[in-house]
């Protein structure tokens, strides 16, 4: 699928081309306007939009935050905006890009192939991670080395996509961000004095579930697919089908897979989309160099390691919010259940210590329960006494024992 956004102005393409050629990122000039636009959007949101809206929407909270927390607040606003934007775009491309779907049958195209729509996703992600790198480096004491490492490795992974390299996997790994909205909501609940409430509890469960599913299960599986495709392509010497390949007795031979658009039936847009799949690949294209595979796979490994580490920290954080604290909205229910357990335990202890009850003991118990039954009758008639909590009833029975 072609890039749905307009192309960059020619002067910008010509200005970027020398740098992109030096870095061997040939598709970057055609998406540089999207990279810059994303960076400007996120920086403007952090510096202007978030402070302005936060002062209006939360006049009694945001202005009273200290400088450190206010910076963190604005960064979380940007993160929330970016995750909603990039997730929607990535899912749309994965479902609508037919040329990308055709790459499912070819490891070579998944590594070397390119579509404008996937390039858009990589551009938006690159713009965000450039901003993320700047913020993480500037406020290193606030966010720590882990966030900085994430920014560096993520930027490297998505920037390498402009070779193009693993352009197919751009939307795939962006789905890591599906858990980010829940993470930001959890953080905002703490700052809005909603810690321990129902919203934070349910959001926390969704956060752990989505994070585990998207980053740990989906992410690890897709990383293994990347490793497999890279290994296959690096060691590809002979492949059947319409493949032209210069064999130089080395895994660094050039590789080229043409698409002729025969299935487009004269559709001009289809032909254009098909022709750009190998737009930046030709007979002069070298196979994957070892350093590129090493950098990409190492960055991917770092990201996956961070994901597993953060998952453990999130479980610890959620437990601290709720462990040992009765839920604010259910204190009476919790006390009622506790009193029932205590009553049952006391009866069990009595039977264990005193042995089975004699008929005389049972008669005494029957007499002792008579007042409780009368209270139950009053409860059925709707008296005020019947509205007393089950905790008091339970305590009354325990004391009689």
Question: Where is each model-derived feature located?
Answer:
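Membrane-helix and juxtamembrane interface regions of eukaryotic multi-pass membrane proteins
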Residues: 1-168, 193, 199-214, 218-224, ...
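Hydrophobic alpha-helical membrane segments of integral membrane proteins
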Residues: 168-175
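Alpha-helical transmembrane segments and their membrane-interface exit regions
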Residues: 175-186
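Blade-edge beta-strand/turn elements of extracellular beta-propeller
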Residues: 188, 194-195
